């Protein structure tokens, strides 16, 4: 499951003196945190482990050390990580695991932790004060009876005041990822909101798809919005070995280029 809430705040169920529920949210040690100098601090609770390491997206493996301050924890500070989105795979005794106290994304056909390191010269993917569009979920059934779920982004005011231009862009994710990655890891909604807010683009609907989406499903989705099958569609595909950081940059250039 992909989630982006503060995972370090986990509820602790307790009762007060009268026996009434009095749950609280104690802070636990962050599994992944980014420091002011953009280093990555990693922590994992694994008291019985013989070895713990993390493998970064560039393939570098960093060994963690037993914490002298926190019993059962392994820790390390990693300097000079790549800016942007970074997959971080925790390894315990040589086996990949998911750290429940760190953000979780999806890649390599499995759940995987990640770190988001601020970029100095790129902020289109960040949440900003601007008009925000909407994300819709559409369920479709193909000829084989398989039900699929696809995500659609429409900009603020879509369908009003001539904002609807009838233009569509289909995003196709990498083979080892899923269409929801466009929202959580690609930050497509934020990028589109910010580009629209600055007048760089206007009235483009985005369909976020897996690599197996069919033309029939695309047609069914666009028909809901009154868009004809003959309407021109732009296609943008994430490379199988492309980082999400690179994909975000390329997507911004792509969208500005088709205006």
Per-region residue spans from a language model:
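Non-catalytic cap/lid and distal C-terminal segments of serine-dependent acyl enzymes
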Residues: 3-22, 27-28, 34-53, 57-61, ...
């Amino acid at each position: 499951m992909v989630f982006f809430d503060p995972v370090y705040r986990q509820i602790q169920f307790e009762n007060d003196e009268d026996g009434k529920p009095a749950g609280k949210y104690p802070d636990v040690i962050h599994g992944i945190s980014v420091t002011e100098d953009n280093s990555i601090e990693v922590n994992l609770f694994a008291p019985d482990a013989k070895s713990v390491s993390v493998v970064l997206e560039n393939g570098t493996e960093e060994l963690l050390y037993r914490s002298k301050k926190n019993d059962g924890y392994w820790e390390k500070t990693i300097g000079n990580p790549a800016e942007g989105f970074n997959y971080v795979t925790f390894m315990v005794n040589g086996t990949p695991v998911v750290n429940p106290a760190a953000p979780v994304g999806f890649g390599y056909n499995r759940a995987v932790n990640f770190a988001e390191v601020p970029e100095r010269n790129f902020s289109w993917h960040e949440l900003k004060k601007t008009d925000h569009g909407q994300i819709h979920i559409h369920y479709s059934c193909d000829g084989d009876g398989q039900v699929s779920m696809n995500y659609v982004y429409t900009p603020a005011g879509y369908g009003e005041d001539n904002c609807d231009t009838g233009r569509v862009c289909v995003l196709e994710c990498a083979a080892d990822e899923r269409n929801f990655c466009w929202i959580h890891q690609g930050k497509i909604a934020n990028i589109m909101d910010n580009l629209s807010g600055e007048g760089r683009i206007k009235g483009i609907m985005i369909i976020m798809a897996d690599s197996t989406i069919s033309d029939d499903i695309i047609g069914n989705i666009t028909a809901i919005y009154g868009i004809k099958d003959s309407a021109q569609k732009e296609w943008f595909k994430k490379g199988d070995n492309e980082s999400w950081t690179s994909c975000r940059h390329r997507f911004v250039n792509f969208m500005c280029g088709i205006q």
